[in-house]
Every structure is written in structure tokens, then in C-alpha cells.
UniProtKB/Swiss-Prot annotation:
The keyword Hydrolase applies. One of its GO terms (molecular function) is dihydroorotase activity. This is Dihydroorotase. Binds 2 Zn(2+) ions per subunit. One of its GO terms (cellular component) is cytosol. The active site is at D248. Transmembrane segments: none annotated. The keyword Nucleotidyltransferase does not apply. GO terms for biological process: 'de novo' pyrimidine nucleobase biosynthetic process; 'de novo' UMP biosynthetic process. It holds the Pfam family Amidohydro_1. Its cofactor is Zn(2+). It comes from Cupriavidus pinatubonensis (strain JMP 134 / LMG 1197) (Cupriavidus necator (strain JMP 134)). The gene is pyrC.
């Protein structure tokens, strides 16, 4: 049984850092484990221009504690009106590494998102031309579609036509949650990848309801059936370079999670690599963790691998019940429980 595993320093290819006091509270958790992260642009207001991305990047770097090394990889928020010129400027900036597609109303702060992908043809053509990846929240939001079917329907309605019309566009299918999505990414032609979260590797939808409502397991896309979880584990541990680590760590104050209309999102930045190690260990695939966490993402984005390392040791430790979060507190996934791996 492996007791210690040292890997190339990993990256997080899907992260929410928020802003202001919340940013300052959560950034050190990510920087302790990851060399870089793709930063989601769904602030209020959203980050829709290169100028806004540059300012947000500066705020992130200003919040980074002294002695910590971390590179934020910025993204723009795609809207129905994103001009092609902004895409060209984003690519030229050197610090914007993708453009995020949120279907309007799909998740937190997505109200300004895309209402019809056909309205974005100019921006998408520019992205394909300059080589800027499209990062897709892959769910439809129609009221008549069951929430557990949103991802599968998105593949048929949006992803398939998108890939047909822009076959050379680099696309990341973010935080996939279904066997359908895993199979789609595995079999797709052209430059397609996918991020997978630790919580979707470890849990199925029963976790939300065991013994009562468990709001800290509620995220979007929502956890799915066990058959889908098993398919995600198989994809992540397959050795395919199309699948890579993206925590989708999404902090919300405790009072906004434990609420009559609670926010979606799981906070995992504090213990992300420990959770991934648990998932890969359970699958008997610790030897596949380094590629998933440290190699596949940089290869897809055309970036060098990190030069440092991170060590995971088999060691029991108790996760805090809550964490400081500005004037509030934040409850991490599995709060107060014992974890079996420790990152150093």
C-alpha cells in the first residue's frame, strides 16, 4: 500500500476565488497546493473585458500572502454581445487563457450569460482563429428539462452543433457529471477536454439527502446517480489526456448555504488534493493521479508543467468544522470529518 506520493505541483483548471475579503480568505488555500488556476469570471459585475480581467488579476496578486507563489490564469465571461475584437485582445494580453460560456441562469451569477449560442458566432469564430479556449458550463436551463438531465440534453442541443460549426475551437467541457459527458469527451474529434471535480468523483446524489438535507453537498451541476460517478472515476483514471483536474471550489458564507434558498457550490480548495488522492486511491489508480492533476491541463492549454512538487502522505487528520470568511464563516466539504491523506 502506497504511504507517500510525490507529484509535480498540480494546477486547478476551474476555480472560484470571489473578490474582496472573500478572496483574501480563500486564496491561500489554493496557493498552498496549486501552482496555477483558471479563475472563473462570474463576479458581480462579471469580468467581460480584458481591462476588467487585468484589474481582477491585480487584486488576486495583491491578496497573495508574502512568500507564496501562485499564477492566476484569467478568463472572460462570454455574453451575447462579446465582440470579436475583445477576443483578439484577450489572446494578445498573455494573461487571459479562456472564455467562459454560462448559459443564462445556469448557476451562481450567470444572469448575464448567453441566451442563444448563435448570437456568439463572431466571438466563437475569433476564438477558433486565435486559439483561445471556450470553457463551457454544459447545462441547458429550460424549465421543462429535469435538473438531472440538463447535461445530457446540452450535449445534443448545444455541444454537438457547436463542435460541428467550429471544429477547430478548443473546448473544455467543465465539471462534467455524467457518463454521457465522459463518453462524449472521450470519443469527440478535435480539441476537446474536460475538468472533473473531487466531489463528483467521491459522491453521488444520495450525499445531498442522507439523514436530511445536506446543503454543503449541493452544487451545480448537481451530483448524479452512482452509475455516473463510476463513469467519471473511470474517465479520470483512464490515462486519457482529455481529462484533468478542476475543483470548481466555490465558497459561500455559511448563512447563504444553510438557508431556505441556499447557494450552490462546494468548498474544497483547502483539502482538494487530499480528496483527489482519496478518489484515486479507492480506484487503485494512484499512479494515474499525477497526469490528471499536473500534466493533462498544461498540455491542453499549451503551457509548461510546473517545476515544483507536492507530496501526499497517508495520514489521518481532522478537517476544521468551519473557516474564516471575511465577516462570516465558510464550511468546507466534509467539515469536521477525518481525511486519510495529507498534502505537504
Amino acid at each position: 500500500m502506497t504511504q507517500k506520493l510525490t507529484i509535480t505541483r498540480p494546477d486547478d483548471w476551474h476555480l472560484h476565488l470571489r473578490d474582496g475579503a472573500a478572496l483574501a480568505a480563500v486564496l491561500p488555500d489554493t496557493a498552498r497546493q496549486f501552482g496555477r488556476a483558471i479563475i472563473m469570471p462570474n463576479l458581480k459585475p462579471p469580468v467581460t473585458t480584458v481591462e476588467q480581467a487585468q484589474a481582477y488579476r491585480a487584486r488576486i496578486l495583491a491578496a497573495l500572502p508574502a512568500g507564496m507563489s501562485f499564477e492566476p490564469l484569467m478568463t472572460l465571461y462570454l455574453t451575447d454581445n462579446t465582440p470579436a475584437e475583445e477576443i483578439v485582445a484577450a489572446k494578445a494580453s498573455g494573461f487571459v487563457h479562456g472564455v467562459k460560456l454560462y448559459p443564462a441562469g445556469a448557476t451562481t451569477n450567470s444572469d448575464a450569460g448567453v441566451t442563444d449560442i448563435r448570437r456568439c458566432a463572431g466571438a466563437l469564430e475569433a476564438m477558433q482563429r486565435v486559439g483561445l479556449p471556450l470553457l463551457v458550463h454544459g447545462e441547458v436551463t429550460d424549465g421543462d428539462i429535469d435538473i438531472f438531465d440538463r447535461e445530457a440534453v446540452f450535449i445534443d442541443r448545444v455541444m454537438t452543433p457547436l463542435r460541428r460549426d467550429f471544429p477547430e475551437l478548443k473546448v473544455v467541457f467543465e465539471h462534467i457529471t455524467t457518463r454521457d459527458a465522459a463518453q462524449y469527451v472521450r470519443d469527440a474529434s478535435g480539441p476537446v477536454g474536460a475538468t472533473i471535480t473531487a466531489h463528483h468523483l467521491l459522491y453521488n446524489r444520495n450525499a445531498i439527502f442522507t439523514g436530511g438535507i445536506r446543503p454543503h453537498y449541493y452544487c451545480l451541476p448537481v451530483l448524479k446517480r452512482e452509475t455516473h460517478r463510476e463513469a467519471l472515476v473511470a474517465a479520470a483514471t483512464s490515462g486519457s489526456d482529455r481529462f484533468f483536474l478542476g475543483t470548481d471550489s466555490a465558497p459561500h458564507a455559511r448563512g447563504l448555504k444553510e438557508h431556505a434558498c441556499g447557494c450552490a457550490g462546494c468548498y474544497t480548495a483547502l483539502h482538494a488534493m487530499e480528496l483527489y488522492a482519496e478518489a484515486f486511491d479507492a480506484a487503485g489508480a494512484l499512479d494515474k493521479l499525477e497526469a490528471f492533476a499536473s500534466f493533462n491541463g498544461p498540455a491542453f492549454y499549451g503551457l509548461p508543467r510546473n517545476t515544483g512538487t507536492l507530496t501526499l502522505e497517508r495520514e489521518d487528520w481532522q478537517l476544521p468544522a468551519e473557516l474564516p470568511y471575511g465577516d462570516a464563516t465558510l464550511v468546507p466539504l466534509r467539515a469536521g470529518e477525518t481525511l486519510r491523506w495529507k498534502a505537504r
